Regions:
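Conserved class I S-adenosyl-L-methionine
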Residues: 1-40, 53-54, 76
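Short glycine-centered segments of the SAM/dcSAM-binding site in methyltransferase folds
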Residues: 43, 63, 135-137
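Class I SAM-dependent methyltransferase SAM/SAH-binding core
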Residues: 45-98
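A short acidic, Gly/Pro-enriched loop at the edge of an enzyme's catalytic core
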Residues: 97-109
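A short SAM/SAH-binding and catalytic strip from SAM-dependent methyltransferases
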Residues: 108-120
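A short glycine-rich, Lys/Arg-flanked "PGG" loop and its adjoining helix->strand segment in the class I
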Residues: 122-137
């Protein structure tokens, strides 16, 4: 599936995504974030942030950057960030296979439920490695 088609599909589901998939993936997201043991001021990238279901679970003492290719999904995530007053969260529309971040930008990269939903998972994993600092963590 090409990137444009993926974007259309996810944008079409954006407003109902949480009701359909929220409970299904909640336990996995929660487990990932609880086991992060994130340190104060840690910079965390969430690849495929979607509607931002996991955003309220992250510790507020960390800087969270979320990316997604679907504008519709990001709109939902932005609403959640505003509702929960998450000043520590930045959201960007971006292709996970061609991230616009500098090398070694993040302490931790989280990509839950993403690699099966992208056209070229190898590019995405390669980019995650590139933007994660040496000694950092990549969690999928």
């Amino acid at each position: 599936m090409d990137l444009a088609k993926i974007e259309r599909v996810y944008t079409s589901y954006a407003k109902i995504y949480d009701r359909i998939f929220g409970k299904v993936f909640h336990e996995g997201r929660q487990s990932i974030i609880q086991n992060l043991n994130a340190q104060p001021h840690e910079k965390i990238l969430e690849v495929g942030v979607g509607t931002g279901l996991a955003l309220p679970m992250y510790p507020r003492h960390c800087q969270i950057v979320g990316i997604d290719f679907s504008e519709g999904m990001l709109d939902q995530a932005k609403q959640k960030a505003a509702e929960h007053r998450m000043d520590h969260v930045e959201l960007h529309r971006m292709d996970a296979g061609e991230m616009e971040f500098k090398d070694d930008s993040f302490d931790t990269v989280v990509a839950a439920y993403v690699v099966t939903a992208v056209p070229d998972y190898r590019k995405v994993v390669s980019e995650m490695i590139r933007v994660c600092r040496p000694g950092g963590r990549i969690i999928m």
